[in-house]
Amino acid sequence: MLRVRKRRAAPQDIYPACKVANNCPPDIQNKIEQTTVADKILQYGSLGIFLGGLGIGTGKGGGGRYGYTPLGDSGAVRVGGRSTPVRPTVPVETVGPRDILPIDSLDPLGPSVIELEDIPATTVEVVAEVHPISDTPQIPAPTTDESSSAVLHIPQESPAARTITRSQYNNPLFRITASADIASGEASASDNIFIDVDTPGQIVGQEIPLVNFDMGPISTEGELETEFTTSTPRTTQVQERPTRFYNRRYYEQVPVTAPEFITRPASLVTFENPAFERSVSLIFEQDLEDILNAPDQDFRDIVYLSRPTYSRAPDGRMRLSRLGRRATISTRSGVTIGAQSHFYMDISSISSNDGIELQTLGEASGETVVQSSLAASDPIEAEHSFIEPAPSIDSYDIVSLQSETYSDEHLLDMYEPVGSSLQLQISDVRGRPTVIDIPFRPRRPPLGPINAGVDIYSPTASVGSPTINPTDLDIPLIIIHLDNSTGDYDLHPSLRKRRKLVHI
């Protein structure tokens, strides 16, 4: 049988693993560590001769560091490598046209040769020297006189030019007035800054009207709060209802009215009653192949029922919630698929009760009114019934308890006609009495003969018992005595027709 030889891995892949275990094949170890026969010859021979840079060894020939150099060629070529492109030399001088083209257009009517004149170029240097004037002429202050006119003397010399700089800093507490007037005829410019604290400052910001915080008269009278929704009010805001159970996209909302949902929720899922704690979750392990109806149809296919959660309903009542998981579909792999249902039940509500009117005990006016209603539109009203007042203590006979004998009158009970004069009256909405007719049917005479029997008629009076002579024919005499008022009767069995019995 021929076997295909599997190719061994490369020596570079085998050597790192076998070196650790110290079980490398000799050929691989000598090749990697360069201890073959050829490597040893080169190592020993290099002691006497120089073979530097040739790359002679057990590896593949690469021509050394600089490659093989063919005879008669100065360039070195590496075997198996790419050719090195030759970079051209950079030109020293720029290559381009040296003739200058004319810019202006030529006149066709002019001569063919235009002689150009050389214009000498001259450079004019302009130097501006400023000589400041040390002595400033004094201008006398003019005086005014009513009889003489004002004369302004203007000097012939022009004033020297000066550079004036100004730095202004705004301060809202002061108002700064800066003025600089340079007019002709003045020897110098004046820059006057006036700072006056009497002038009003600049308004900065926005004018906001103030709010009047006067709340008016405060009442010191206390108010009685009667609209309490909880027995212990809290200042913190209470969450109305948990939002995680009321998402109709993920949970089915199922209201529950059975009281067992509070104390024994397991009885709604299965017919058994296992022992459990109220505050823990319930897990119902049942085979899905066995179709069993739950006591409550809302809890069918339930396999998990969480612990109770208390919250506040939107109408203010306390709500008990449980989260259930159904196992409606079961796959072959045992995975169950079902929806999640939110079962909730509103327990109670705390509202303000109306005041209860108390009745006075121990007093009776002798007049009683009884009211009731069979429907909202047909009330039943009872007329006033006058009850006789109770007899006074003087009407009773005082009997000594020490006496041994009592009369019969003391043992008789007194009959009090209480309620004998009551009248029941049914009236409609408008108050008109409604008369109800009770039909009374008289008794009809009974059908058929009454006291039917055998009568013996004798035309003559006879004394004693009559004599009856029996006949020879022995005929049974059947007497049917009818004494009923309904007219029904029963036949004697001898008068009924006999049935033929067929035996098979």
From Swiss-Prot:
Q: Where in the cell is it found?
A: Virion; Host nucleus; Host early endosome; Host Golgi apparatus
Q: What is its main location?
A: virion
One molecular function GO term is: structural molecule activity
Instruction: Choose any GO biological process term that the UniProt entry carries and state it.
Output: microtubule-dependent intracellular transport of viral material towards nucleus
Assigned GO CC terms: host cell; host cell endosome; host cell Golgi apparatus; host cell nucleus; viral capsid
Q: Where are the transmembrane segments?
A: none
- Nuclear localization signal, short sequence motif: residues: 1-9, 497-504
Q: In this record, what's one Pfam family?
A: Late_protein_L2
Q: Which cysteines are joined by disulfide bonds?
A: 18-24
Report keywords, A-Z: Capsid protein, Cytoplasmic inwards viral transport, Disulfide bond, DNA-binding, Host endosome, Host Golgi apparatus, Host nucleus, Host-virus interaction, Late protein, Microtubular inwards viral transport, Phosphoprotein, Viral penetration into host nucleus, Virion, Virus entry into host cell
| Family note | Belongs to the papillomaviridae L2 protein family.
Q: What does this protein do?
A: Minor protein of the capsid that localizes along the inner surface of the virion, within the central cavities beneath the L1 pentamers. Plays a role in capsid stabilization through interaction with the major capsid protein L1. Once the virion enters the host cell, L2 escorts the genomic DNA into the nucleus by promoting escape from the endosomal compartments and traffic through the host Golgi network.
Q: What is this protein called?
A: Minor capsid protein L2
Upper taxonomic lineage:
Viruses, Monodnaviria, Shotokuvirae, Cossaviricota, Papovaviricetes
